[in-house]
């Protein structure tokens, strides 16, 4: 029911998320679990929602700027999974696209408040967003490609009214992203710290976000250094097996030059990924895991942009 909408990125929107998390936690305190599933669910919700509130208290929930998972990408990535078969579906895309400019203006207000409080992402993270804004809106970027490839599933053109709305709103969204990039460069980048290191307090929050657990950071770093040394030694030994006397870089170059390990074009890459995914499901299902039917097919796709990296969306 919200396919035409975009999240509220204003300070009030972030406040609403925090308020919902706080009210949900209060209601959880009144819930009595009836079985082990309830116990696990309640514990997981308390951990996630509690961490959300801690992150909000530190101000980092509304200051995120990076190359992969921040509102700068979210306002564009949201269109990747929208169906594009029918005129009605394209009309929905056009309507949602028309809301991008307002969302990015809201984001500016939120980021300005965070910047004024001294809560700013690293310079490299801010610069990555600036670069992506330019890439999205370039002559061969995402928005130009979306307009050029807009057609129905049977290959026929969009109805004239839908096509006109789409063009108007895509051009407005592109203009909004250009404006955002310029604004970030002028308003946020000068205040962004040059160091990538986030600091212990922020790192502790982020590690809990990714791990779902609190770990001893010193012990974890020591383990990480040991693992890095082990992997480095393994890489060097493997390089010798591939080509005696070769460094790791030379062994990689040797493999890249071998036609047996080459893929040409996105179609070959997509087919290779799909084959590996299907093979993995076939090997694991019924032997190591009972994989539900909706997850039997992992659809491998090539994202319309070349920013960020590989990502997965649930079924």
Regions found by a protein language model. Give the residues of each.
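N-terminal maturation segment of proteins
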Residues: 1-315
């Amino acid at each position: 029911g919200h396919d035409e909408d975009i999240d509220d990125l204003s300070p009030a929107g972030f406040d609403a998320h925090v308020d919902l998390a706080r009210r949900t936690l209060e209601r959880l305190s009144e819930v009595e679990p009836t079985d082990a599933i309830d116990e696990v669910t309640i514990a997981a919700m308390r951990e996630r929602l509690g961490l959300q509130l801690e992150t909000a208290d530190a101000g980092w929930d509304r200051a995120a700027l990076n190359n992969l998972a921040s509102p700068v990408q979210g306002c564009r990535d949201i269109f990747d999974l929208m169906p594009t078969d029918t005129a009605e579906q394209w009309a929905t895309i056009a309507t949602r696209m028309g809301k991008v400019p307002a969302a990015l203006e809201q984001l500016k207000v939120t980021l300005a408040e965070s910047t004024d409080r001294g809560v700013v992402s690293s310079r490299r993270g801010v610069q990555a967003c600036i670069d992506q804004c330019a890439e999205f809106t370039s002559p061969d970027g995402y928005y130009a490609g979306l307009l050029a490839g807009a057609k129905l599933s049977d290959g026929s053109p969009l109805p004239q009214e839908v096509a006109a709305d789409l063009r108007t709103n895509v051009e407005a969204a592109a203009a909004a992203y250009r404006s955002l990039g310029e604004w970030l460069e002028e308003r946020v980048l000068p205040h962004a710290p040059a160091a990538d290191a986030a600091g212990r307090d922020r790192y502790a929050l982020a590690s809990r976000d990714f791990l779902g657990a609190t770990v001893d950071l010193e012990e974890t770093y020591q383990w990480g250094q040991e693992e890095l040394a082990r992997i480095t030694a393994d890489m060097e030994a493997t390089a010798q097996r591939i080509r005696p006397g070769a460094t790791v870089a030379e062994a990689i170059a040797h493999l890249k030059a071998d036609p047996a390990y080459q893929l040409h074009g996105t179609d070959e890459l997509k087919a290779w990924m799909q084959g590996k995914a299907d093979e993995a499901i076939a090997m694991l299902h019924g032997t190591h895991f009972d994989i539900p039917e909706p997850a039997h097919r992992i659809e491998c796709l090539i994202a319309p942009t070349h920013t960020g990296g590989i990502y997965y969306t649930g079924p």
